[in-house]
């Protein structure tokens, strides 16, 4: 945003990217907004890597997710923009086909959210237009952060060449495949390695799922559950942590190695004799120093009923009102206080050894005290620091 002599331009809203701690800038659609294709960056980067001998798969946010995540500030809504957005994606497919792109990936994480009839109608409408007279590069529909229980049957009957499903956070993904099957003329990009956390994959569990899929004669490509941008790049430069902990970690490069090893193991009848399998078995056979049998037992006993919060919201409201005595419209801040220049400066001095850790702790405590006092002085009902 900008506020100054030249004008007042409000910044676009920033929201969390689904259930991650990453954020995105929310596009705003006004009534006079014109939807058109500008893919110069995407096709340019594809051509650049192609000249280097690197075969890539261009990835873009899909049309349905794009429509669902925009903010409509005028009288128009997603349905009004659906045809124009779909036409832009049709043109993108044509451009990629002209560049001899083999696969074009559409990321559609919005499909894992609860979908009502209007959402399903929008999804069908936009892709009906996208696929009208479709020829050219193969389209991969990639989903993540959950399962697509509301539209799985629809998806498998649409002309996608590949479908990416999340087997980590998608609790019903396996069940959906068992119940409705998976088309023999499509490729399943199976998200079997967690793309969001930094832990090693348990090969035994993953290989079992791979065997089940291949027993169904499904054409499977092993993949991560989502983009690897959510994890650090590599373990190679982690020199300060003990190997006792590092051996359990897998960052982006290590997760790619896991995919490669899993692919090799899955092709071998005698995979239990291979070194990669033995190393993984040893890792999970041992006891971690942070293990708690009590916690493991509690987790094993978790059922679907445990995901239902009790008591009901109306009862919780009454209890909270009685306990805290807050007014009907309590005042608070929207979140934590900003990292001011002096806070950043003090942290930098700590890293350089200019101040001691105790001096830094005392400084932070003084800042917290200032924040709390300021909130008390202006009369906020709920304090944060």
Tell what function each PLM region has.
Residues 1-385:
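Domain-level signal for soluble alpha/beta catalytic cores
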């Amino acid at each position: 945003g900008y506020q100054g002599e030249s004008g007042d331009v409000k910044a676009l809203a920033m929201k969390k990217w689904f259930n991650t701690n990453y954020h995105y800038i929310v596009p705003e659609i006004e009534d006079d907004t014109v939807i058109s294709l500008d893919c110069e960056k995407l096709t340019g980067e594809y051509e650049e890597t192609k000249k280097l001998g690197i075969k890539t798969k261009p990835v873009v946010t899909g049309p349905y997710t794009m429509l669902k995540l925009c903010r409509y500030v005028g009288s128009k809504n997603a349905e009004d923009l659906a045809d124009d957005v779909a036409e832009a994606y049709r043109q993108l497919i044509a451009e990629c086909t002209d560049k001899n792109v083999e696969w074009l990936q559409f990321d559609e994480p919005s499909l894992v959210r609860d979908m009502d009839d209007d959402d399903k109608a929008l999804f069908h409408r936009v892709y009906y237009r996208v696929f009208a007279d479709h020829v050219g590069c193969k389209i991969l529909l990639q989903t993540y952060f959950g399962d697509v229980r509301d539209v799985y049957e629809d998806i498998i009957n649409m002309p996608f060449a590949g479908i990416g499903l999340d087997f980590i956070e998608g609790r019903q993904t396996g069940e959906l495949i068992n119940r409705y099957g998976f088309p023999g003329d499509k490729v399943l990009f199976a998200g079997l390695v967690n793309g969001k956390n930094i832990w090693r994959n348990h090969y035994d569990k993953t290989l079992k799922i791979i065997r089940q899929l291949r027993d169904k004669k499904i054409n499977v490509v092993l993949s991560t559950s989502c983009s690897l941008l959510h994890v650090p790049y590599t373990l190679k430069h982690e020199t300060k942590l003990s190997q006792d902990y590092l051996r359990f970690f897998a960052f982006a490069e290590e997760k790619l190695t896991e995919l490669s090893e899993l692919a090799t193991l899955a092709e071998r009848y005698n995979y239990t004799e291979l070194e990669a399998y033995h190393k993984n078995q040893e890792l999970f056979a041992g006891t971690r120093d942070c293990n708690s049998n009590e916690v493991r037992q509690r987790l094993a006993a978790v059922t679907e009923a445990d995901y239902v919060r009790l008591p009901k919201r109306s009862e919780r409201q009454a209890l909270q009102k009685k306990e805290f005595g807050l007014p009907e419209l309590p005042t608070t801040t929207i979140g934590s206080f900003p990292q001011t220049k002096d806070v950043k400066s003090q942290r930098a001095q700590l890293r350089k050894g200019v101040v001691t850790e105790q001096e830094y702790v005392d400084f932070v405590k003084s800042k917290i005290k200032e924040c709390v006092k300021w909130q008390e002085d202006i009369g906020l009902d709920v304090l944060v620091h």
